[in-house]
From Swiss-Prot:
Protein name per Swiss-Prot or TrEMBL: DNA mismatch repair protein MutL
Native organism: Aeromonas hydrophila subsp. hydrophila (strain ATCC 7966 / DSM 30187 / BCRC 13018 / CCUG 14551 / JCM 1027 / KCTC 2358 / NCIMB 9240 / NCTC 8049)
Superkingdom of origin organism: Bacteria
Matches recorded under InterPro entries: DNA_mismatch_repair_CS, DNA_mismatch_repair_MutL, DNA_mismatch_S5_2-like, HATPase_C_sf, MutL/Mlh/PMS, MutL/Mlh/Pms-like, MutL_C, MutL_C_dimsub
GO biological process, one term: mismatch repair
Annotated region described as Disordered, given as residue ranges: 376-401
Pfam families found in the cross-reference section: DNA_mis_repair, HATPase_c_3, MutL_C
Similarity comment: Belongs to the DNA mismatch repair MutL/HexB family.
Role description: This protein is involved in the repair of mismatches in DNA. It is required for dam-dependent methyl-directed DNA mismatch repair. May act as a 'molecular matchmaker', a protein that promotes the formation of a stable complex between two or more DNA-binding proteins in an ATP-dependent manner without itself being part of a final effector complex.
Gene Ontology cellular-component terms listed: mismatch repair complex
Keywords for the protein's UniProt record, in alphabetical order: DNA damage, DNA repair
HAMAP family: DNA_mis_repair
Length: 622
């Protein structure tokens, strides 16, 4: 058979195979068009479950007469014009296929009027070439689309339609979902001439809660927690039922991304993990959740019906949802008798993530590390602890910044020689036991902090400082253990039999390190949870290495074992190539001053800079 261009009606019917699955698919596409047109009132009339008639009437902006032919053509849309528009899409529709596809498998009439027109116009596509005829009509500002005899010309598709009751149940559920996505829109649903659903526009919190109750029912409202959390450009809000409000089926699970109805595996996985052990296997969570983020951070053009999306920062979104819901559920504790007991969740995260394209910092995946040991003064209520006289740094002057490039020449390392005995004794002597006088000037190569005191400069190694603080913090809190965080995708790997047995023997120790493993059968282990420190590491390589380390130190006492394992965590968790921002560097300096001021006299931690030769050059040059 030779290659040929398909006739328009056949091409549209093929496209309809993806877009028009059943009558509810038609309702979805047409109502989304109404919402994109700015309608705040949409009426939906259904006859015979949608097989006989689907009529959508709205008060949106309408379509001009000279655009009606295009409206029924394939790949014609007013919603995107360039690739940039597609990458940051805000509308519900964008492909320009729906009307052409629907008209190819039904008898469709499209009647519309804009505010600028004195009369309305009606369009209808007919025949093999799908030619559009236009005639005047009576209609207020807005649009009405009538779809009659769905699948009349595709008997095979019509044969797969279910009963009238089943098809209308799908439409009813769709309208309920739309009602929760747009509280500001009045929705009326009729079936065979009778009003089945009527949702008035809800513009206040009380009205929104009434609509929520109308859609989800009173039992859901009784157990509902209002939750809201925000991190950088990502916001999560909505309602979720406590475990006591769980249901025997998953019929009350609504999620929306930027106002778009969604059934996304990643989102569902994060929600299930948040409930984790709170629900038995035969119970399902109930929730209505809204995720709002930069449209450029989500790709909606990955599913024919737009039910799924692809997040550019998938792990960030997954862990953000998990952390927000996990925190809300644990804060709530037992079920509250008060409906809608609002829980404002503030995630303990580090510096905001910058969009687009920047990978999240490793610290984001859990509580921000505070490596200070719980000092006695702090436990007793002191607000300053041992930080002493340390003052927040002031930014360096322009004159100081100009000279820094020529000043950053460090002395060679002096093996075994105390800093006070080094060649730069005057500078070393200036390093105080209390570093309150030290002033942080700027970052150098995002790995060192330039310090100044009495016109003398020194460099602080931020990696060494953080490793020291982290090691001390881990040892101090070893008995409490590290918090385990679920992996987006569990990691499985094969182990020799002796290490499989070791995992079972050392289960308690591994959990103390924030690692949870379970058997995958026949020499296979599955890693399901890790501490935040190891989130961004090569887990398949590190876990066997860790198990061998534990095995080799099995004869050591508990204290020695803790020191070895804490050092291992530090080395794996803080890479030598780690980069820092100024705020993090300054925090590390504050904690170093408070707990390890003696380390400021260690040339491995702080190196003085040789200024004498530079100053001499300036002097010689007058």
């Amino acid at each position: 058979m030779p290659i040929r261009i398909l006739p328009p009606i056949l091409a549209n019917q093929i496209a309809a195979g993806e877009v028009v699955e059943r009558p509810s698919s038609v309702v979805k596409e047409l109502v989304e068009n109404s919402l994109d047109a700015g309608a705040d009132r949409v009426e939906i009339d259904i006859d015979k479950g949608g097989a006989k008639l689907i009529r959508i009437r709205d008060n949106g902006s309408g379509v001009a007469k000279d655009e009606l032919v295009l409206a029924l053509s394939r790949h014609a849309t007013s919603k995107v014009a360039t690739l940039d528009d597609l990458e940051g899409i805000n509308s519900l529709g964008f492909r320009g296929e729906a009307l052409a596809s629907i008209s190819s498998v039904s008898r469709l009439t499209f009647t519309s009027r804009t505010a600028e027109q004195s009369e309305a116009w009606q369009a209808q596509a007919e025949g093999r070439e799908m030619s559009v005829t236009i005639k005047p009509a009576a209609h207020p500002v807005g649009t009405t689309v009538e779809v009659v005899d769905l699948f009349f010309n595709t008997p095979a598709r019509r044969k797969f339609m279910r009963s009238e009751k089943t098809e209308f149940a799908h439409i009813d559920e769709l309208v309920r979902r739309i009602a929760l996505s747009r509280f500001d829109v009045t929705l009326i649903l009729r079936h065979n001439g009778k009003v089945v659903r009527q949702y008035k526009a809800a513009n206040t919190v009380a009205e929104q809660e009434r609509r929520l109750a109308a859609v989800c029912g009173s039992p859901f409202m009784h157990y509902a927690l209002a939750v809201e959390s925000e991190h950088s450009d990502v916001r999560l809000w909505g309602w979720l039922a406590t475990p006591e409000g769980a249901r025997p089926q998953n019929d009350l699970q609504y999620t929306y991304v930027n106002g778009r109805m969604m059934r996304d595996k990643l989102i569902n996985h994060a929600i299930r993990q948040a409930y984790d052990e709170l629900l038995p296997a035969d119970r399902f969570a109930a929730y209505v959740l809204y995720i709002e983020l930069d449209p450029r951070q989500v790709d909606v053009n990955v599913h024919p019906a737009k039910h799924e999306v692809r997040f550019h920062q998938a792990r960030l979104i997954h862990d953000f949802i998990f952390q927000a819901l996990f925190t809300a559920l644990r804060q709530q504790g037992a079920a509250s008798d008060e409906p809608l007991a609002e829980t404002l969740v503030e995630l303990p995260v580090s510096a905001p993530i910058e969009y687009p394209g920047q990978a999240p910092r490793a610290e984001w995946y859990g509580a921000e590390h505070n490596y200070r040991a719980p000092a006695r003064e702090v436990r007793e209520g002191s607000s300053t602890g041992r930080a002493g006289n340390y003052q927040p740094p002031e930014p360096p002057s322009r004159e100081a910044m100009r000279g820094m490039g020529s000043l950053l020449t460090t002395l060679p390392a002096v093996q075994g020689t105390p800093l006070a005995e080094a060649e730069t004794a005057p500078v070393a002597a200036a390093v105080p036991a209390k570093a309150g006088a030290w002033r942080a000037l700027t970052l150098v190569e995002q790995a060192y902090l330039l310090l100044e005191r009495d016109n003398r400069l020194a460099l602080l190694s931020l990696v060494r400082a953080e490793r020291l603080l982290l090691r001390h913090w881990l040892l101090e809190t070893w008995g409490q253990g590290l918090a385990a965080q679920p992996l987006l995708l569990p990691v499985s790997f094969k182990l020799p039999k002796n290490l499989v047995a070791l995992v079972e023997q050392q289960d308690r120790l591994l959990k103390r390190m924030g690692l949870e493993l379970k058997s995958g059968g026949r020499d296979t282990m599955i890693l399901t949870r890790v501490p935040a420190l190891l989130r961004q590491t090569d887990l398949v390589r590190l876990l066997p290495e860790l198990l061998q380390l534990i095995e080799s130190g099995s004869d050591s006492d508990a204290g020695q074992q803790a020191e070895v394992l804490c050092q291992w965590l530090v080395e794996q968790g803080i890479s030598r190539e780690k980069v820092y921002d100024f705020a993090t560097a300054n925090r590390l300096l504050t904690e170093l001053v408070a707990d390890f001021s003696d380390q400021l006299a260690n040339v491995r931690m702080v190196r003085p800079l040789a200024l004498a030769s530079v100053l001499a050059e300036f002097a010689d040059g007058h």
